[in-house]
From Swiss-Prot:
CDD domains in the record: secretory_peroxidase
Organism expressing this protein natively: Ipomoea batatas (Sweet potato)
Main location, first listed in the record: secreted
Disulfide bridge partners, by residue number: C71-C149, C102-C107, C156-C344, C235-C256
Chain residues that bind Ca(2+) 2: T229, D269, S271, D276
InterPro entries according to UniProt: Haem_peroxidase, Haem_peroxidase_sf, Peroxidase_pln, Peroxidases_AS, Peroxidases_heam-ligand_BS, Secretory_peroxidase
UniProt-annotated location(s): Secreted
Cofactor note: Binds 2 calcium ions per subunit. Binds 1 heme b (iron(II)-protoporphyrin IX) group per subunit.
Name this protein carries in UniProt: Neutral peroxidase
GO molecular function: heme binding; lactoperoxidase activity; metal ion binding
UniProt catalytic activity: 2 a phenolic donor + H2O2 = 2 a phenolic radical donor + 2 H2O
Catalytic residues as annotated in Swiss-Prot or TrEMBL: H100 (proton acceptor)
Length: 348
């Protein structure tokens, strides 16, 4: 009996810690005045499974919603971790793929739809063509979730959100809260991809307007641009002078002109495999790679944000996580037909 009481006390302590962490995140997100999100340590995040505690107590596996959701989180994380371990660059690609989905008519998985004889999707837009990647990782993660969590339908839009969060975790050993419940659009918006996505040649005014249209202020715009602390840009993009910060033209390691199929890559900052503050350090020095990057130094508000994140990695990670949570909850456009796709690249 004493042994059982001791085990029960320990288990309840674990549950109390988990609920305290969840409450902290929920209270932070719901506060109308919040500017920062307290990051969740990786040992106490969305993969915490109540079934572990119940099993420890001898009550068997739980069939509750928490356990079902965590099955999905675990199934997606397994694939994402393996993909990034095999190729670090894939982490940046998955964050970008989620961004490019959500910024066109909300987080609806529209970017994943392939063209057909009767349908032209978003993948051929200039911002996406020969640029966004990671589709096969999303497909694998979706199949893994379908196989291991058959009782919990998960949308492709959900998989994108989870994959981006897990990429952030893989880079930083920090995480943030993602909930399930998104649905997939039965259509995509090529025109929207051409007009709503930020472009490397956008000046500060245009960038500000595009982010404001999605409900983001300039500080949030700057912190989301900080995703350029990881990943690469293609020489095919950089050889177009309007895309490149001209301060970098003399040292650009590309052979220009470059064809659309050119495979040359340049790191978006000096440490493209590390989620750090070097991106912001480069902006302050006038050495941002893209024209749109360096434009963030053109107003008092954006300069203040850039300097904030240059000086404090913790503030960068916290604010980035909060902005990603906000972005991951951008709703689909009104009137769009929704479903949960069986295969992410085509409608049911």
């Amino acid at each position: 009996m004493a042994s059982f009481v001791a085990r029960l006390t320990l288990a309840l302590s674990f549950i109390a810690l988990a609920l305290a962490g969840y409450s902290l995140v929920q209270n932070t997100l719901s506060s109308p005045t919040h500017t920062r999100l307290n990051l969740i340590p990786t040992w106490l995040d969305s993969t915490f499974d109540s079934a572990d505690v119940l099993s420890y107590l001898g009550f068997g596996k739980s069939s509750g919603r928490l356990s079902d959701s965590n099955c999905v989180f675990s199934a997606v994380k397994e694939i994402v971790d393996a993909a990034i371990t095999a190729e670090t660059r894939m982490g940046a690609s998955l964050i970008r793929l989620h961004f490019h989905d959500c910024f066109v008519d909300g987080c609806d998985g529209g970017i994943l739809l392939n063209d057909t004889a009767n349908f032209t999707g978003e993948q051929g837009a200039p911002a996406n063509s020969n640029s966004v990647r990671g589709f096969s990782v999303i497909d694998q993660a979706k199949r893994n979730a379908q196989t291991k969590c058959a009782d919990t339908p998960v949308s492709c839009a959900d998989v994108l959100a989870i994959a981006a969060r897990d990429a952030f975790r893989k880079f930083t050993n920090q995480t943030y809260n993602i909930t399930l419940g998104r649905q997939d659009a039965r259509t995509a918006n090529l025109t929207g991809a051409n007009t709503q996505l930020p472009a490397p040649f956008d000046n500060l005014s245009i960038q500000t307007a595009k982010f404001a249209d999605k409900g983001f202020n300039q500080r949030e715009m700057v912190v989301l641009a900080g995703a350029h602390t990881v990943g690469f840009s293609r020489c095919a993009v950089l050889c177009t002078s309007t895309n490149l910060n001209q301060n970098r033209s003399a040292t650009l390691q590309c052979t220009c002109p470059a064809s659309a199929n050119d495979t040359g890559l340049v790191g978006l900052d000096p440490s493209p495999g590390t989620f750090d503050k070097k991106y912001f350090e480069e902006l302050v020095k006038g050495q941002g790679l893209l024209f749109s990057d360096q434009e963030l130094m053109q107003s008092n508000a954006t300069v203040t944000a850039v300097r904030r994140y240059r000086d404090a990695t913790g503030a960068f990670l916290t604010d980035f996580a909060a902005a990603m949570v906000k972005m991951s909850n951008l709703p689909p456009s009104a009137g769009v037909q929704l479903e949960i796709r069986n295969v992410c690249s085509r409608v049911n």
